[in-house]
């Protein structure tokens, strides 16, 4: 693993612990649970460091699972191209794919995150 990501993963662990404390103190306030994929159905920006963490998580996956993620990501990009939308324009992409199967995060496999330990901060809260 790239050691540059270690401080980020430590921070992500702190976020996880804080979220767990919130869930404990205020049941129902934090809706995230294992198998919940509501946040996987939206578009949001992530930092370059988070993207690197996701990349590292993808590298740890078995080949068949990594290829499945790539196929889903490619399908979303292809759908945007079919509609004439630049995938780098996040707002346009989000509007175009909202309500379609392509809106689901490509890392989501059957309602679970394939890169769970390397997911971005927004996916942890």
What spans do the regions from the language model cover?
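Hydrophobic scaffolds flanking metal-cofactor catalytic centers in soluble metalloenzymes
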Residues: 1-125
